[in-house]
């Protein structure tokens, strides 16, 4: 069974905090533990990590659109799976690019609409499109610019 090797989260906001661009390394698919205080972001992390697998999934009424900016800046979530049954290490990355748009409903209230596309990449060694190197943002004039 494939195991999660690394997870990359880009541009997720919650409780006044931001995950700008972080890679969580699970060192060859070993078990992982998130030990955070209440309000530390465990639910946000789990909900975010599930997005490439079940886009739009929510937990206990918290919607992924609550963690996205409304200014058309995309967020990315990527999971690198270590495949089993291969002679040399082999990886499969599943990813999603998320953004939200505010749409005016019939009752003149704004409705948060999730927009996304998914992508995949398989590889057996590091390359320009692996989870670490795929270019989804850069810093220009002290600000992050997202693609």
Specify the residue positions occupied by each region the protein language model found:
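Extreme N-terminal "head/tail" segments of very large remodeling/mechanoenzyme assemblies
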Residues: 1-145
């Amino acid at each position: 069974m494939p195991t999660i090797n690394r997870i990359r989260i880009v541009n997720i906001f919650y409780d006044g905090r931001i995950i700008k661009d972080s890679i969580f390394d699970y060192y060859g698919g070993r078990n992982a533990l998130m030990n955070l205080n209440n309000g530390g972001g465990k639910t946000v992390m789990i909900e975010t990590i599930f997005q490439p697998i079940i886009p739009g999934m929510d937990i206990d009424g918290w919607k992924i659109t609550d963690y996205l900016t409304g200014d058309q800046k995309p967020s990315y979530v990527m999971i690198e799976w270590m495949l089993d049954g291969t002679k040399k290490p082999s990886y499969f990355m599943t990813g999603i690019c998320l953004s939200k748009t505010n749409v005016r409903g019939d009752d003149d209230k704004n409705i948060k609409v999730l927009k996304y596309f998914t992508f995949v990449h398989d590889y057996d060694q590091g390359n320009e499109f692996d989870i670490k190197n795929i270019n989804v943002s850069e810093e220009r004039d002290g600000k992050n610019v997202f693609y």
